[in-house]
């Protein structure tokens, strides 16, 4: 009996005065979680850079080899449904990854599962149509607009992303994020790579190119914010994810949205009659039909790499951050294009070298905000666990 009372007293004392390891375990758990988060964000940034670089290199290769300059004006602006399709069609390769990535423990307390599933299906369809529209507009804008017009108008997409994020996602801006946004826009304007498929001076349709590029920018900005809304308000609350953000959600989103976008682009391809011109396009390709097919396959894979990385940044951080990273990759992509091609005596000039330095500042400003946010969580946990004011 005495031993029992002594053991109870010891247990009570142990509960009142827990060991240091017990006190620090929540902090260690949060530190580990934050390290995993930083690794995930870094991986997504790498995927965006890799995908963006491969897309621009292969797009330039495709249009250089396509004998575009020797075609009549009407034919030069064809093939945009094919390019829109290529941006989305490689999603089946992501299906094995969906089953490889682990799924969190299901939340058995989730209610209204049918309502959530219905909302999710509607969002997937809506986002798929929006992505298909952006893909088509992007392909048209690239061909109709010259380099200067396309770059200047495309830079406004980050402004629209910020506006939509404030309205749709209730995004809170800090002075460091605003600095990052301004820097990213300037980086994109002065550091974007040249494009081999842009029109000659006598081919330009100034009113058309401006509106096409503008519409593509708005569609892209809106899609980023809607992706974030879908992640935070719908997908994360489903029973299978149990209120946890995991990379498997990115794969699911990309597969479902790309499926809808692919269907829309296929309908457009056959309805416009572009499918009948595919054989002629392959015959005009300078490197031959084999390289024509391989370049399209490479483009399709590269677009998926880029999209998965971008979607991951939207999940782990925000749509604004995803767009900032996308724009900040432009100087490095331009460097790769300059090394691989020679367009109109294009070179990696001093303004572009300056944008590389500005990229460090722009991303550093946003990273500083993320660091402060994570540090604040650590301080709050320290206060809670130690019951003191800091």
UniProtKB/Swiss-Prot annotation:
Subcellular location per the Swiss-Prot or TrEMBL entry: Membrane
Checking InterPro entries in the record gives: PUP_plant (IPR030182)
- One Pfam family recorded for the sequence: PUNUT
Composition bias (Polar residues) maps to 1-14
Query: Which top-level group of life is the source organism from?
Result: Eukaryota
Membrane topology label: Multi-pass membrane protein
Record field: transmembrane = 39-59, 81-101, 120-140, 148-168, 176-196, 211-231, 250-270, 297-317, 324-344, 348-368
Q: Name one GO biological process term.
A: purine nucleobase transport
Which residues are annotated as modified residue Phosphoserine in the UniProt record? 25
Question: Which keywords does the record carry?
Answer: Membrane, Phosphoprotein, Transmembrane, Transmembrane helix, Transport
> Which GO molecular function terms does the record list?
purine nucleobase transmembrane transporter activity; purine nucleoside transmembrane transporter activity
Q: Which family does it belong to?
A: Belongs to the purine permeases (TC 2.A.7.14) family.
Its recorded name reads: Probable purine permease 18
Main localization category: membrane
Q: Which PROSITE patterns match?
A: LIPOCALIN
Q: Where is this region: Disordered?
A: 1-23
Q: What is the lineage of its organism?
A: Eukaryota, Viridiplantae, Streptophyta, Embryophyta, Tracheophyta
Q: Name one GO cellular component term.
A: membrane
